[in-house]
Amino acid sequence: MSGHSKWHNIQGRKNAQDAKRGKIFQKISHDLYVAAKAGGADPSANASLRLVMDKAKAANMPKDNVQRALDKATGAGDVKFEEATYEGYAPGGIAVLVETSTDNINRTVSNVRNSFNHHGGSLGTSGSVSFQFDRRGHFVIDRQSHPDITEDQVMEDAIEAGAEDVQTSDDAFEIFSQPADFAAVEGALTDKGYDLAESEITMIPQNPVEVPEADQEKFEKLIDELEDNDDVLAVYTTAD
């Protein structure tokens, strides 16, 4: 269905964060991890991974960083990693999910807890906020990259590819799928010539809320500190 899209606002915040080189590499590392975890570390047999590796090359990401992300996903190398997801609340009552992959679970939980405590948040228990999110495949087509494309055409192609929802705005088309259909939808869209500005499995908040102005600074500092943690793969919030 068509609907209001907040991709432009979200993208603006992402662009500001990605001004730091490390943020760009962290995002690519996360996408490498997710793609390799889902479909293996061989890019010739994993279209999703191949696309992310192209992004890594374009960003001049060091090969060691790429290999580290793949090793985390596949369990290769001398160091073994385990996944853990932490849930809590940021200032203003904003729900936060923190996905991690770590070789030292005690270090990671301590660092995550300290980040919450230092910035006015609180680390909760498993299940305390995850019910407020839905895991979905998420694809973005920037309308500037496809100026002649119509909403009806995108809708038809997305549904044919196996997507479950399409939202439109002046800036972009957003396409959503079930996680199990992610690779098939991504492959079908790229085969049709779409340049995907975003292509990821993510957590979508069911009811986004505004961050109270009085809590904005603490909220941003908490999220920035969590994202700067080397063990953190991704941070999701219910912030609008």
From Swiss-Prot:
Subcellular location as annotated: Cytoplasm
Gene Ontology process terms (BP): regulation of DNA-templated transcription
Keywords on record: Cytoplasm, DNA-binding, Transcription, Transcription regulation
GO CC field: cytosol
Stored SUPFAM superfamilies: YebC-like
Source lineage: Bacteria, Bacillati, Bacillota, Bacilli, Lactobacillales
Main location: cytoplasm
InterPro entries: Integrase-like_N, TACO1_YebC-like_2nd/3rd_dom, TACO1_YebC_N, Transcrip_reg_TACO1-like, Transcrip_reg_TACO1-like_dom3, YebC-like
Molecular-function GO terms, alphabetical: DNA binding
Superkingdom classification of source: Bacteria
Protein name: Probable transcriptional regulatory protein OEOE_0768
Ranges where the record places region Disordered: 1-21
Pfam families recorded: TACO1_YebC_N, Transcrip_reg
Recorded family membership: Belongs to the TACO1 family.
